[in-house]
């Protein structure tokens, strides 16, 4: 995570940005935590969505354990983790959610697969828990009630360690910002505050 955060700072330096707002979703939220804990003077406001601090604050579901599964089986398991309500009956009762059921199966691209595995390894060892009090930015932490990848308790843990933070929970899973129409509006409003 430290390298991802350093890359973000290098890009900001190249663009001439002394400080900036940050939006981190899932793995990006892990990177954002590392960024704000390591470079607190660079982050003005930050939104963390469906993410985890690692360590004693709670880790996200160990997705690396699914890497060896057949791609279609992995997609089916991932679906249930992404929203714990998703089962056959749910999709019968909520046909509008059928799009979530279509598995994204990527095969044949060895560089993509290699990148995915390296990302899984990075998140496997993510732990910024002890350094979260270093974060000085105003932070909105948001979780989906039915997220089986980054459970709400993990977002609440993050909020407990950052002095200037607000925790909100939305009706949805790991993609709550698509499922709950109020989420994106509130995220944008938070980032637009002076």
Which sequence ranges carry the predicted segments?
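Active-site loop/oxyanion-hole signature of alpha/beta-hydrolase fold enzymes
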Residues: 1-23
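Acidic catalytic loop of the alpha/beta-hydrolase fold
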Residues: 145-150
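Gly/Ala-rich beta-loop-alpha elbow adjacent to hydrolase catalytic centers
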Residues: 24, 28, 32
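Short alpha-helix in the alpha/beta-hydrolase fold that links the catalytic acid
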Residues: 128, 137, 151-160
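Catalytic active-site module of serine/aspartate enzymes centered on a nucleophile-bearing elbow/loop
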Residues: 164-194
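Conserved alpha/beta-hydrolase catalytic His-Asp/Glu region
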Residues: 57, 78-124, 131
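Flexible "cap/lid" loop of the alpha/beta hydrolase fold
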Residues: 33, 37, 44-73
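Short beta-strand/loop motif that positions the catalytic acidic residue
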Residues: 135, 141-143
